[in-house]
Amino acid sequence: MNEDNLIWIDLEMTGLNPERDRILEIATLITDNELSILSEGPVLTIYQPESQLLLMDEWNTYTHSSNGLLKEVRSSKLNECDASILVLKFLKNWVPCKSSPMCGSSVAQDRRFLLKYMSELESYFSYRYLDVSTIKELMFRWRPDLKTGLQLHKSHRALADIQESVLELKYYRKYFINCN
């Protein structure tokens, strides 16, 4: 356990509104300060009833059908509470409570869903964020020439997306922030 380790998280959801939409998948991983992946947490698919899945818009329905997530959601036996307990068990082996910012891409959106459906997990993070999307926005505005050097696949599966977020931050660190 190390208080300098970083917790990375990604959620896949039925939509963007936590008042109506639900979590479909959650994944976490741990890096050190140099962004080396130390461990990958459980990748958990959360059951949602068909009535909830029918509320998804066209983009979410197509994307989560194409990548196989909806099939896994329909056969999952886990609910949000089960998933939260399993993720916390993993995190407690690597990072003390309240010591890591929430790391990932557009993690403020993920935090809204965690607060609504997995509040104990949400409270494990510090109040801070390490949001790769913010750095991306700055790079696009200040160094648009760097856009072409990074190829992302965005499978819209939780583990693959956070692995890409770590790679993305490594790229920005090397070419945009220049601290190597």
Curated annotation (Swiss-Prot):
EC number: 3.1.15.-
Annotated signal peptide: none
Entry keywords, A to Z: Cytoplasm, Exonuclease, Hydrolase, Nuclease
Any single GO CC term annotated in Swiss-Prot or TrEMBL for this entry: cytoplasm
Protein name, as recorded: Oligoribonuclease
Primary location: cytoplasm
Family: Belongs to the oligoribonuclease family.
GO molecular function: 3'-5'-RNA exonuclease activity; nucleic acid binding
InterPro entries found in the cross-reference section: Exonuclease_RNaseT/DNA_pol3, Oligoribonuclease, RNaseH-like_sf, RNaseH_sf
Active site (catalytic residues): Y127
NCBIfam families reported in the protein's UniProt record: PRK05359.1
UniProt-annotated location(s): Cytoplasm
GO process terms (BP): DNA metabolic process
Functional description taken from the UniProt entry: 3'-to-5' exoribonuclease specific for small oligoribonucleotides.
Top-level taxon of the source organism: Bacteria
SUPFAM superfamilies for the chain: Ribonuclease H-like (SSF53098)
Ranges of residues in domain Exonuclease: 6-169
PANTHER family in UniProt: OLIGORIBONUCLEASE, MITOCHONDRIAL (PTHR11046:SF0)
